C-alpha cells in the first residue's frame, strides 16, 4: 500500500519496469513475385506488463479487484510496393495496412487515484482506479514516392 508510506513504493532488484513487457516477438516476411513487386507482412506481439503505480508488482487484482497489469497483444501489418523502374524511372507506389485484424489492445496503463466515480459523479474521497492507453485501430494508406 503506497499511500501508507507517503506514496513511496519499494522497488527491488528483479522487479519489472512498468509498461515494459517481459517478452516481445516480431516476425517479418517478404515475398517478391518479380523485381518490380514486393509484398510484406509483419506480426508483432508483446506479453503483459505491469501498470505504472504497480512498480513493485505487489498490487494483486484478485485481492482488491483493481486491474494491475496491461494485457498482452499481437498486431498484424501488411505492406506492398510496386517499382515503375521499367516505365517511370524512380517512381514507386506503395500501400500499407496496420492492425489488419483491428485488434482492440492496450499499450500501457496506470494505477492512480481519482475523485470521479464510475458513473462520472464527483467523490469526496479519492478512489483507486486503473486507466489503460488504447492501441491504434486499423489504418491504411496508399502513397506515391519518387526516389533519385
Briefly describe each language-model feature range:
Residues 21-25, 72-76, 136-140:
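Residues that define the transmembrane beta-barrel architecture of outer-membrane proteins
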Residues 10-16, 62-68, 127-132:
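Extracellular loop and loop/strand-boundary signature of outer-membrane beta-barrel proteins
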Residues 45-55, 82-148:
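C-terminal beta-signal and adjacent terminal beta-strands/loops
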Residues 34-38, 73-77, 88-92, 139:
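Active-site lining segments that contact anionic ligands and/or coordinate catalytic metals
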Residues 1-55, 145-147:
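Gram-negative outer-membrane beta-barrel transporters
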Residues 20, 32-34, 71, 86, ...:
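Surface-exposed coil/turn segments at beta-strand junctions on protein surfaces, enriched
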Residues 49-67:
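A contiguous binding-surface segment within folded domains or other stable secondary-structure elements
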Amino acid at each position: 500500500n503506497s499511500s501508507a508510506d507517503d506514496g513511496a513504493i519499494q522497488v527491488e532488484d528483479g522487479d519489472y519496469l512498468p509498461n515494459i513487457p517481459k517478452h516481445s516477438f516480431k516476425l517479418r516476411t517478404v515475398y517478391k513475385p518479380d523485381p518490380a513487386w514486393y509484398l510484406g507482412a509483419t506480426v508483432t506481439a508483446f506479453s503483459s506488463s505491469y501498470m505504472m503505480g504497480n512498480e513493485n508488482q505487489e498490487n494483486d487484482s484478485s485481492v482488491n479487484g483493481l486491474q494491475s497489469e496491461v494485457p498482452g497483444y499481437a498486431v498484424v501489418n501488411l505492406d506492398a510496393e510496386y517499382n515503375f523502374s521499367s516505365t517511370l524511372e524512380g517512381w514507386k507506389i506503395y500501400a500499407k495496412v496496420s492492425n489488419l485484424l483491428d485488434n482492440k489492445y492496450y499499450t500501457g496503463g496506470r494505477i492512480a487515484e481519482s475523485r470521479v466515480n464510475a458513473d462520472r459523479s464527483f467523490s469526496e474521497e479519492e478512489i483507486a482506479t486503473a486507466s489503460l492507453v488504447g492501441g491504434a485501430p486499423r489504418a491504411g494508406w496508399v502513397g506515391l514516392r519518387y526516389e533519385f
